[in-house]
């Protein structure tokens, strides 16, 4: 679900040179390499490395649009995932914010890859490091997800994120724990351990390096 105007697309392409700002909006880009693409407790690429990256446009009013991609391996035709998303974030009170939006998860790689396409709507609430999100499956995909995460710093450079959730009829209950920090030169690292009731033969581990542009 992507409704970016031509002028915004042109600005987005320039973002590969670094984060830039317009009069009322900011465009940024990111790229990452991970040893294992994990989504809601389940590996999305058969525990193999994945190259990932995306672009984001955010207006000062709170509206945002973005696209993010990754290599995937589900054992079928799918080889590439592209997520198109948009939404609106706003403050409810000092330190208390909300986020509403839509995401299209689109898959490429073969004749039947598009059969895995999924659309979701989401509603999120954030306060004091806690994020509570509800994801509503749309179209033929009606599995809903509720997720709670908490992020905090243990030093000035090192952060921790703890997540629990329930992905109805897919991974069911899942959890993850991640620690992240800077490597230098604008490059960050992240180590995540995750598991789920369904969809994995073992606990998943991922080490990632990323850079925002």
Language model regions located:
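Outer-membrane beta-barrel proteins
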Residues: 2-213
